[in-house]
């Protein structure tokens, strides 16, 4: 399981270019910062109030540096700290290029459900609703299924975070773009066939004529 999540995080890291300002959600998205190439600078934003997230802290963490999910993280030397109002002003003002989020379900039209399973206690919506509305790109990183049940649906069954917001989905099986006419597979991991990824997906997938092999490195 860990290797599959690493695969997803490594591939997501390839989405960004030098100078990008990107929000990282909690969970799997935090791993993306670990795999940014050394020759580019990508500034990662955390909505609890800082820009300059680096890798997750594994030893002797600074207890004053946590991300929005409460995980200890490290910070780059150029880190900037600010209050929550300014943080969400950056998001709502469209100054954050993309957000990387996890998901429970994604619908074929780009609807996202990632904040609650009815009947289970959660802390609250968090910043996901604002991020989905304010960021030009919403990239979902997740395992393709949950205990064999497809997470990419015809229609979400869980309460929505936002409607028609997802632009790209990256799973262990491939990379998919959400377009007006559905979900298109643009990269397929060599471990899987077209039939495999379709069988693990509830909605119909479309395969881009220029589809290539999913690369991790």
Regions found by a protein language model. Name each.
Residues 3-7, 58-217:
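Conserved phosphate- and dinucleotide-binding cores of soluble alpha/beta proteins
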Residues 1-76:
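N-terminal active-site beta-alpha-beta segment that forms phosphate/nucleotide-binding
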């Amino acid at each position: 399981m860990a290797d599959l999540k690493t695969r997803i995080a490594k591939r997501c890291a390839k989405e960004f270019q030098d100078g990008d300002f990107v929000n990282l959600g909690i969970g799997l998205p935090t791993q993306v910062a670990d795999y940014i190439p050394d020759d580019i600078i990508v500034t990662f934003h955390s909505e609890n109030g800082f820009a300059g997230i680096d890798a997750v802290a594994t030893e002797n963490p600074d207890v004053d540096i946590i991300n929005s999910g409460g995980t200890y993280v490290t910070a780059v030397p150029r880190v900037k700290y600010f209050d929550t109002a300014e943080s969400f002003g950056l998001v709502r003002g469209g100054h954050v290029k993309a957000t990387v989020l996890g998901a429970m379900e994604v619908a074929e039209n780009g609807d996202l459900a990632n904040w609650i399973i009815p009947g289970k206690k959660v802390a609250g919506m968090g910043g996901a609703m604002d991020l989905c509305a304010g960021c030009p790109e919403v990239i979902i990183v997740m395992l393709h299924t949950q205990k064999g049940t497809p997470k990419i649906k015809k229609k979400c069954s869980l309460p929505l975070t936002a409607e028609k917001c997802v632009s790209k989905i990256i799973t262990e099986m491939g990379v998919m773009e959400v377009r007006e006419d559905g979900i298109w597979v643009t990269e397929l991991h060599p471990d899987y066939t077209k039939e495999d990824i379709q069988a693990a997906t509830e909605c119909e997938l479309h395969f881009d004529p220029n589809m290539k092999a999913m690369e991790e490195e």
